[in-house]
Design a protein with these regions (language model features):
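Tandem repeat scaffolds
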Residues: 1-195
Length: 195
């Protein structure tokens, strides 16, 4: 798809594989039951769009940006989010996540302060690196094999979350909330033995 401008449009049941969206702008659009597999964004923007029951796998980006996207009941796999950040003081790529499954996603140097991940989301095999995550809410979230590396997690809530690995030596954790028995895994980086 090339040089297309869409505002306030609704797209339902579309399936794209290997498609390159070049010089396209999507503003305030809704995508329902759509599939995007190994697609690319090239000089394309998505602004304040909503995705419902969509699957996005292996998204690639060149000189593109996404802002304030809402995802509900979506499967997001193998996405590196940092290249999708807007330059300057624009909103972050993700506005809300609800009942979503995120697998093998990478989030680098992103702002998730006060973000609520607890709305029925599952985050598997993903990485948060050098992210701002103060007051983020992961309460009850399945975080199987998800890592937090050098993140600011002050006052973040991990109670009843499971499967996470936190770099406690490189992350800021003051007043973060954890629950047992999962919190014992935080000690792994200290190379100590508990008995």
């Amino acid at each position: 798809m090339t040089e297309r401008y869409c505002e306030g449009e609704r797209f339902t049941g579309l399936s794209f594989a290997g498609e390159i969206f070049e010089s396209c702008d999507f503003a305030d659009c809704v995508f329902v039951d759509c599939s995007f597999t190994k697609c690319g964004l090239d000089h394309t923007t998505l602004n304040e769009c909503r995705f419902v029951r969509c699957e996005i796998t292996g998204l690639r980006s060149v000189s593109s940006s996404v802002q304030s996207l809402d995802f509900e009941d979506c499967r997001l796999q193998e996405i590196e989010w940092a290249p999708l950040l807007s330059s300057g003081a624009f909103p972050d790529p993700i506005h809300t996540l609800k009942d979503c499954s995120l697998k093998y996603n990478t989030f680098t140097e992103m702002n998730f302060n006060r973000f609520d991940f607890s709305n029925g989301n599952e985050i598997v095999g993903s990485m948060f690196a050098k992210c701002e995550m103060q007051l983020a809410n992961f309460k009850g979230t399945e975080l199987h094999e998800t890592e937090f590396y050098q993140c600011d997690l002050r006052k973040a809530d991990f109670r009843d979350a499971a499967g996470y690995k936190v770099d406690i030596l490189g992350s800021r954790l003051k007043d973060a909330k954890f629950s047992l028995p999962e919190a014992v895994n935080l000690l792994a980086d200290l190379k100590i033995k508990l008995s």
